[in-house]
């Protein structure tokens, strides 16, 4: 069964500060591309899997750059469309040597926020074996929220393997309560849920990885893997498997943004290849470690050769 992965989401232009300092005082920025599902698409394609990505872009330089990156990485873009009225979203990202960088979004009323049920109905899900969704798509607008529910329910009906990463973006939601209820409802349709400990604290009231996993298994998932930062990840399955997978030590953390998407890439591609779950999660911790040593959101995502070298050191 080699059908490939389909993703739907919002990619953005990414302006990365060239020096440390507040975003309003930095003089220069480097241009890249970002977006949670976009990062997973790139990571999966670099590991030589068939990937298709759906989004809506503005007819602007950011949109054209995104299409160029999709083509460079051989990602299927037949479901990428352009809006005549709306622009591609973009974001500013600071540079820091300690903790997470400052981020500022320009994505309200973006082209991707107009994606709707009619758009996603065009995807013939029977052509794919896996779908990866995040909690960002339903946060963009009422239309994208309906589209996310349509997709995840349809994928469930069609028997695709569904992975879901909460990817919390509180600033995009009307309220924390709406965010929690929507994301936990979407997660109930997923086979695999990939929360972080801090996300667990918000979504179900605890940052204890064992309790987080218990919650999502009872919520409907077959597998829950909670990311525990540099410690690694805690795995639980409906078959009563429970274990920790240790993380990799890194020499220097440069940028933590994108590490979770790298982690998702590792688990999803591992399962697509039929690896045992523990090995897929070990791959995930490796890709997450590689990504935190890179400046951009997806530049560090490895090829198969680079991944093998890192894991066999």
Predicted regions and their residues:
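Short, conserved phosphate/pyrophosphate- and ester-handling motifs at nucleotide-, phospho-/glycolipid
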Residues: 44, 196, 260
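Anion (oxyanion) recognition and catalysis
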Residues: 45, 71, 153-157, 187, ...
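Conserved N-terminal subdomain of the carbohydrate kinase-like
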Residues: 50-135, 308-313
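Conserved phosphate/ATP/ADP-binding segment of small-molecule kinases
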Residues: 158, 170-242
């Amino acid at each position: 069964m080699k059908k490939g992965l389909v993703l739907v989401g919002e990619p953005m232009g990414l302006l990365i500060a060239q020096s440390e300092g507040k975003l309003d005082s930095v003089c220069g920025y480097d241009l890249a591309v970002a977006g949670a599902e976009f990062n997973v698409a790139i990571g999966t394609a670099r590991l030589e899997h068939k990937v298709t990505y759906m989004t809506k872009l503005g007819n602007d330089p950011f949109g054209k750059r995104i299409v160029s990156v999709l083509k460079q990485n051989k990602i299927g873009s037949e479901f990428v469309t352009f809006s005549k009225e709306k622009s591609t979203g973009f974001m500013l990202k600071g540079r820091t040597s300690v903790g997470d960088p400052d981020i500022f979004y320009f994505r309200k009323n973006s082209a991707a926020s107009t994606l709707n049920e009619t758009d996603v109905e065009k995807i013939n899900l029977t052509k794919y074996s896996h779908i990866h969704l995040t909690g960002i798509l339903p946060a963009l607008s009422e239309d994208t929220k309906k589209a996310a529910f349509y997709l995840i329910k349809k994928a469930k009906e069609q028997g695709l393997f569904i992975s879901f990463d909460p990817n919390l973006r509180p600033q995009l939601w009307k309220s924390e309560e709406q965010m929690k209820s929507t994301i936990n409802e979407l997660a109930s349709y997923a086979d695999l849920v990939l929360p972080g400990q801090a996300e667990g604290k918000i979504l179900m009231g605890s940052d204890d990885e064992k309790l987080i996993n218990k919650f999502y298994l009872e919520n409907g998932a077959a597998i829950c893997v909670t990311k525990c930062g540099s410690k690694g990840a805690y795995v639980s399955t409906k078959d009563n498997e429970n274990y920790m997978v240790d993380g990799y030590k890194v020499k220097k953390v440069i940028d933590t943004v994108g590490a979770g998407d790298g982690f998702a890439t590792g688990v999803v591609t591992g399962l697509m290849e039929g690896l045992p779950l523990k090995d897929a999660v070990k791959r995930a911790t490796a890709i997450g470690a590689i990504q935190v040593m890179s400046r951009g959101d997806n530049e560090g995502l490895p090829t198969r050769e680079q991944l093998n070298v890192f894991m066999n050191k």
